[in-house]
């Protein structure tokens, strides 16, 4: 009986270790498989969490001779319960088992089995169980070790994929490549531009948030066809050189910068580094190309561009090349006029908020440069659907209006979302938010400012989690505040 219980304990801990490694792989994937970024994320997590302290307590019990049968039963029960909870937890950005993720997961499991197997084979199965629990506790470090071991393999595979993507692009003689980057707004702008250009061209865009070099390479290898005229390539970055790496691959002729703001400051450190990185796209453009950049942001407006023709756009500054006039929010649509290039283009859209109108303007400017007729642009804009979790308006059967802007948050985007909420004059205005993250040393400052802005607009606020609970104490204006 004891031998069976010991075996079941070992298997339960093996299963639990696999679940824990899956979560760590998810976090590593979200940090671009880079140990340095993943390690920065780890520093923001408490080692003394309830879950980890529970594991440490179980390890202590398993290391003693105190009621061994009872301890094993408790261990099995606890780790299986935690495993089930781990499997049932839903994440905004779940793990995607790409080929690379699968290889790394297998590698870290083999590494874990090797250590546990040595402990069990050289001593006893009970020691193997203790080793597995210790591995689960130290899962982040096993994950980083496995990642280091797999680096030579991944570099060789990535080089092969890179060369294949380059070869495909070299065969697309008439392809126009449009790069889009920005601290925020790039994914929405990509979708809007795609919808408009499809009125005239065969267009391929990077799907979802595929904005890393490997995401771009995968799109080219798997989806690019000889009949494509235009490739819209979203370009993300968390450090200097990231945009240049993608530009070296795809060689864009047109570049759009939607924003330069204080986001990802944990990795960029300064707003100057953000500006430098985003403008790697403009710097990569040929003299015959075009840069379309948003002058509503000071770090774009004050950056000279000399290597390529440029069109600067703003919401309201009539001194820019393009701006917007006559904004009207009707019950069923937003109506506005894009003014610039000697034209006044009247448009109607289902989208709400000035940030969306700004992104639409960038798409319209680019479409006109590519000779898309005005009627086609007007039709395309009218058919654009809201992008999920990006200032997306929903209405419930009970008459509640929900503005879903949950994809991420940043100082400027949050301010614009609150401005949309401010314009809703009927009913109570309620905000649910975890605050803003990845702002480095300005984390507290900007969340404090967000709290003040919320107090001016909202009747109720619910702060999700404790990380940015400072939002609760910025002003007494919200009549009710709740932290969960």
Descriptions of predicted regions:
Residues 257-401, 426-427, 452-460, 466-475:
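Acidic, Mg2+-coordinating active-site environments of NTP-dependent enzymes
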Residues 3-99, 103-107, 111-295, 299-308, ...:
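Phosphate-binding loop of NTP-binding sites
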Residues 217, 243, 268-271, 360-361, ...:
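Conserved strand-to-helix beginnings and helix N-cap segments that scaffold or border functional pockets
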Residues 84-115, 387, 410-472:
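Active-site beta-alpha connecting loops in nucleotide-dependent enzymes
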Residues 231, 402, 431-432:
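Residue-level marker for buried hydrophobic side chains located in beta-strands
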Residues 473-484:
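Single conserved hydrophobic/aromatic residue that forms the stacking wall/gate
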């Amino acid at each position: 009986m004891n031998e069976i219980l010991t075996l079941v304990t070992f298997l339960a801990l093996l299963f639990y270790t696999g679940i824990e490694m899956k979560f760590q792989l998810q976090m590593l994937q979200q940090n671009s498989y880079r140990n340095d970024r993943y390690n920065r994320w780890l520093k923001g997590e408490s080692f003394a969490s309830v879950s980890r302290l529970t594991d440490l307590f179980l390890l202590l019990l398993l290391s003693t001779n105190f009621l061994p049968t009872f301890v094993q039963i408790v261990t099995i029960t606890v780790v299986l319960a935690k495993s089930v909870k781990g499997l049932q937890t839903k994440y905004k950005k779940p793990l995607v088992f790409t080929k690379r993720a699968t290889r790394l997961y297998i590698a870290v499991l083999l590494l874990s089995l090797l250590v546990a197997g040595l402990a069990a084979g050289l001593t006893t199965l009970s020691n193997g169980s203790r080793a597995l629990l210790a591995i689960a506790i130290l899962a982040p470090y096993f994950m980083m070790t496995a990642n280091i071991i797999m680096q030579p393999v991944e570099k060789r595979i990535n080089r092969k994929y890179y060369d294949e993507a380059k070869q495909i692009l070299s065969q697309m003689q008439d392809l126009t490549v449009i790069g889009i980057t920005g601290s925020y707004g790039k994914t929405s702008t990509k979708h809007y531009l795609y919808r408009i250009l499809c009125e005239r061209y065969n267009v391929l865009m990077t799907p979802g948030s595929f904005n890393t070099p490997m995401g771009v390479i995968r799109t080219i290898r798997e989806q690019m066809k000889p009949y494509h005229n235009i490739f819209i390539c979203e370009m993300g970055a968390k450090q200097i050189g990231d945009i240049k790496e993608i530009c070296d691959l795809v060689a864009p002729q047109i570049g759009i910068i939607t924003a330069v703001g204080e986001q990802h400051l944990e990795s960029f450190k300064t707003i100057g580094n953000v500006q430098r990185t985003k403008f790697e796209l403009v710097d990569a453009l040929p003299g015959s190309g075009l840069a379309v950049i948003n002058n509503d942001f000071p770090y774009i407006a004050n950056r000279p561009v000399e290597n390529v023709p440029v069109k600067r756009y703003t919401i309201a500054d009539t001194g820019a090349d393009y701006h917007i006039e006559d904004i009207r929010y009707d019950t069923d649509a937003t109506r506005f006029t894009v003014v610039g290039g000697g034209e006044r283009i009247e448009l109607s859209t289902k989208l709400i908020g000035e940030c969306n109108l700004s992104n639409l303007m960038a798409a319209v400017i680019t479409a006109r440069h590519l000779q898309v007729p005005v009627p086609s642009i007007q039709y395309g804009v009218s058919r654009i659907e809201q992008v999920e979790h990006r200032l997306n308006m929903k209405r419930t059967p009970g008459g509640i209006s929900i503005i879903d802007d949950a994809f991420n948050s940043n100082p400027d985007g949050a301010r614009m979302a609150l401005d949309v909420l401010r314009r809703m004059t009927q009913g109570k205005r309620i905000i649910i938010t975890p605050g803003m993250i990845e702002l480095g040393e300005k984390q507290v400052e900007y969340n404090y400012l967000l709290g003040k802005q919320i107090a001016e607009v909202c009747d109720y606020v619910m702060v999700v989690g404790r990380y940015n609970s400072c939002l609760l104490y910025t002003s007494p204006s919200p009549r009710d505040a709740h932290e969960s």
